[in-house]
Amino acid sequence: NSEEEAVQLFEGIRKNSQSDGIAPYADLVDHYQVVSKTFTYSKNSTYSATSEATLWLRGKGSYFQIQGVVGSATRIQTGTSTASWVQLYNNYNASFPSLSVDFVGSGYFTESRTHSGGGSVNINGFNLTGSTAYTDTYSSDTMSLIWTYKLYA
């Protein structure tokens, strides 16, 4: 399979290193790839958040290894109403070079709704967390964004 071929390619490169420790990396290519996964809030499917990362890959032909994570973040999914996303945690785990990376993030949505007074407007799956004369602020429960990116699925 592709994963085994990739491992064999990189093992061959390591074994063919010159005695002075310089490997023949001239034909290897660095590549940056954006990966992401979108999660829907279980209590209200109108709201979605995305975990996104930019990976640094190095390889040859169609065989690459992940050398590192250049950046990662969680954010609200484009088109998710007028809500805001509050990121609480964002991290990743892998022993580089690697063929996969584990991502872990969490956060919650907030949304303000204006009303004409005398009552509030409910949002399914949200709790009222603040109120002024004509504006109520709602927050969702904390949402976990946990996933694994595999270079060769």
Q: What are the roles of these predicted feature ranges?
A:
Residues 29-32, 54, 104, 138, ...:
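Intrinsically disordered, low-complexity regions of eukaryotic proteins
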